[in-house]
Amino acid sequence: MMHTFLRRLCVVALCLGYIKASADFDCRRTSQSCVTGTCNDVNGDCDCPTDANGVATHRNADCGLEIAKVVPTALCGPPCLNGGECYEPTVGTYMCMCPEAFYGNKCENPRKKVECSGTEITINYMPIPTFSGDIFILDNRNTPECAFTEANGMYTATFTYQQCGVTTTNDQPNAGDTSYEISAAVRFNANIERATDMKLTAKCVIDGTGQSNLNDNIGTVSVDQRTDLTEETALTEYQPVSFQLQGKNGNPMPVPVNLGDELRIYIPLADTGRYTKLKITELQTNNGMVEQDLVMETLIFNGCLTDIGEALVTGDISSDPAIPAIIINFMAFRLRGSPQVKFDARVQVCEGTDTSCDSVVCPSPPQSVPSNPQNIPPANPQNIPPANPQNIPPANPQISPSSSQRKRRAAPDNEVILHETLTVLDPRSNEKLRLPHNKSDIKSQQNADPQQCLQSTEIMVMVIVLIVAVVLLLVITTCLAVKFMKQRAAQVKIYNPDMPTGNNTVRIPRAAC
């Protein structure tokens, strides 16, 4: 029995790569502010100060790490983990400066941690000091058995899979498995709910073979918009890079996106703990359709812009060595047959001594290449998958990732494949925001689209009839009121004190018109 219990017990710490101004830190939140520099009220980033030459003097999410005090990792004894950097705050004192997703002397502890057993789930969250807000299970804020307790800054909640609204899904992700999912809200001001609040979603998976493992998806979305937004998911597998679509200069992407809007692709390296350089080797785009309707173009091939890429990309492929990151500026476009633009990128990451990520000499004029030259697996046309550098999403949602990988060319260990999707509208036309669909989806989408209801002929006729009836009623009421006022004005009251009784009101005849 003990052996079975141990097989079903799993404790997995969340592994979040360092991304500047990630979900754990937002300078717009109460108790989270920039140590130096200024807070960007648009995206919650800290804009770090620079010297007279425009070179940054500080970095980290809160701009609290003075670059001049960063020292070799060896001086911190055992190296800093999870992207932490060794620095010297005072002469002869060496410490690890952790990314915002981790804490501890060596940055060894994740701020979000989930523990799963065969019967219960435990959520642990260590907020960035100084936290004075509130943490609670969604829809169970006042339920005692679902409450978080605080000890030394750590907030913890433990409950069974039958409590607190835990969602149970059988045969997921594989046949015989059981998945349990629960969400918590982190409110940084106990009395105010803002868009900068967080939603934590933990998911435990009990393997149908009797073994247990955890795939915890702890991401962040606005609590007050949690039904509208897609969670930014942090997987247990290490992701060295991410794919982000941004507005010009890194601003939030405009909504909606119209043809000609200035955008950029931003691919940052999560941290420099293992890899220090990156290079985009291929970038393809398609219209999200299937079979004969699929349109695909290659923008980057072998690290160089193609002829199509030269036409669509603004300037050259640039980089931000401070992160480091790849930046590709472009003006919003779309391909024939669909407003959706799907990007598939192949990115190579390198360690310090590896020269394969160095820049290459590109041909002139740019090369013309066939579509999908290296068979980059596109994102599922009917279901937008999250970026998963280690596991290429299967085209068939019913096929497990492991079986799908056996059918496709796997990416090398130092290469990741990323996917992202953008919807672009044409402001010159009166089109509506619709996703491409199969014929089998038409009926369900019509039922779900409120515009279909509003455009119903019968309802429009009824609305017009009601409007006409109301107008006629107002006209009739106005005429009656005017007639009554005229009758009152035509009467003159004459009072005669010599008349003992009777009606003292005399009607004066009016001249005929």
From Swiss-Prot:
The segment annotated Disordered runs over 356-411
Query: Keyword annotations for this protein?
Result: Disulfide bond, EGF-like domain, Glycoprotein, Secreted, Signal
Which CDD domains does the record match to this protein?
EGF_CA
Indicate the segments forming the ZP domain, all copies: 115-364
Keyword Ribonucleoprotein assigned: no
What the entry lists under InterPro entries is as follows:
Cuticlin, EGF-like_dom, ZP_dom
Domain EGF-like: start-end pairs: 72-108
Q: Where do glycans attach?
A: N438, N503
Q: Which SUPFAM superfamilies match?
A: EGF/Laminin
- Tissues where this protein is expressed: Component of the acid-insoluble organic matrix of calcified layers of the shell (at protein level).
Cellular component terms (Gene Ontology): extracellular region
Q: Where is the signal peptide?
A: 1-21
Could you tell me where the Pro residues compositional bias lies? Answer: 375-396
| Annotated compartments | Secreted
Q: List the disulfide bonds.
A: C76-C86, C80-C96, C98-C107
Name the UniProt record assigns to this protein: EGF-like domain-containing protein 1
The protein's organism comes out as Lottia gigantea (Giant owl limpet)
